[in-house]
């Protein structure tokens, strides 16, 4: 399951974690730790005749308690070891390299060689093929293939280019081809790689609110059992005198009984469950900024999903030019290409390519034309070009209609019919207007991904509502939403509309998750309970999110929710198992322990345990061994199934609740029989 090196390191760390400074961080296991020290002290006192405690029996109890503490340490060390192994591979990617810092962005020969660790935010660097990108940054010029395998594990190179949503590059990755001009967005020690190493090593892991709440419950239970166990010594002493039979319970037995009754199973595994949950997220190539974000993912009941890349394939391409009456297709194609020349999105480039392929329309001298490009914004929802007293705009139908009307023009009804036809087919219509005259529509074709409908059905079974977010018009959005099977959609989405939608659901008590990659997504990402920023996205988006997806796959949000739910389920299942164990051990041990004083209790010794000594030893051995048995489950997590929360709870209560009640009875009896056969008791 794991490399030998991790096992070996975990064994060493288990011993190092016996330090009181580390043990005090886990109050439940601190109780076992103190009990082991007391039992060891009683053994030595008995060995030298200072105490009446049985030396051999006390030594056995002391050793088992020490092993219980070591097993708990081992569980945590294994989980941490996995993180360290991942961090070590990341550290190999983080090394100081020489960077070419440009003095002037227009002159790529005028460079200063500088160590990557000395780079500052805003510096411009020039990176060539086969060179390592020195620091996190944003591509401002060029396009190149980048090998990101050191960080993502994905061997296939990816394209990084200026403009659009693939402009972010990460320090430590390598250029495979071409060149890039990069603006540095982070300094040494604060880079994405540095943050990732800190997270996977657990250096910045803090206990989550749910962990703290559960630990308070476990400590409360431990204090109650401590109080109960402490009263047994005077109670049994008084009872034995009154009954004239039996003897007072020994201090060793009080310690052993306390450890058996305290919720040590979940206390030992709680930390490893949290660390393993974060590790599973890291293995999915997602970096969580805090454990709180993972827990929130488990409680999410509303998902906001971008249409492009999540529900559809994301590579919308221009497939047709649909002119209005009185306009030729070539005339529309020419205007569409001009409006898209400076558009660095995949859609914009596809328009340029389609115009070239259909009508052999080539580039022109824009300096001579005195052209001024108008970039797309989320507010105007249009882009275009101004040249030689000509104005061309392309954009969403309603945005273009408002633009034409505001400038005194007429928006033809025929265009509405074309837009409706394209939208009804699930495509995206872009209307082109020149000098306030509508020329026609560009048909951008989009394809719904295979299997998404089934995934959304699974989410619905889990009680999660899915909402598609798109900038498309309502007709296009409705067609794609129906085909994909989402519960609702937000069409013609603006940053403000997304933000308000999140706030509306949060006011109703829902937890909301979303993905984003652009600067315009930052406000909504900052507001969402679970905000997954794409690694290729802008720096603003990454800073606003509480998770970063290294693969930049919007569909990863569904997997993140599943991992979050699995973490909460694992913690809940093992807590249920631990508490059920305590109840079973109570009813297994107490009758045997006291039937010397109260013979009537022998009738409750249903398992027929040999003696009080055997009962205590069997229970405390089981208490230690069950921790080791459950370590793989705490690391791997309880298997998650897509079903309603009520059914899932009933299923887990049956498996881990009932299982937790039955397992101790069977195991303790088997251990008791083994101890008797071996002649130990």
Swiss-Prot record:
Function: Part of the high-affinity ATP-driven potassium transport (or Kdp) system, which catalyzes the hydrolysis of ATP coupled with the electrogenic transport of potassium into the cytoplasm. This subunit is responsible for energy coupling to the transport system and for the release of the potassium ions to the cytoplasm.
Main location (coarse class): membrane
Annotated active site: 306
Species the sequence originates in: Listeria monocytogenes serotype 4b (strain CLIP80459)
UniProt enzyme class: translocase
Xref: PROSITE patterns: ATPASE_E1_E2
Binding-site list for Mg(2+): 517, 521
GO CC annotations, alphabetized: plasma membrane
Gene3D superfamilies: Calcium-transporting ATPase, cytoplasmic domain N, Calcium-transporting ATPase, cytoplasmic transduction domain A, HAD superfamily/HAD-like
Superkingdom of origin: Bacteria
SUPFAM superfamilies linked: Calcium ATPase, transduction domain A, Calcium ATPase, transmembrane domain M, HAD-like, Metal cation-transporting ATPase, ATP-binding domain N
Quaternary structure and interacting proteins, as annotated: The system is composed of three essential subunits: KdpA, KdpB and KdpC.
Record-annotated membrane-spanning stretches: 30-50, 59-79, 216-236, 255-275, 587-607, 615-635, 661-681
PANTHER family: POTASSIUM-TRANSPORTING ATPASE ATP-BINDING SUBUNIT
Name by which UniProt lists this protein: Potassium-transporting ATPase ATP-binding subunit
Subcellular location as annotated: Cell membrane
Keywords: ATP-binding, Cell membrane, Ion transport, Magnesium, Membrane, Metal-binding, Nucleotide-binding, Phosphoprotein, Potassium, Potassium transport, Translocase, Transmembrane, Transmembrane helix, Transport
HAMAP family in UniProt: KdpB
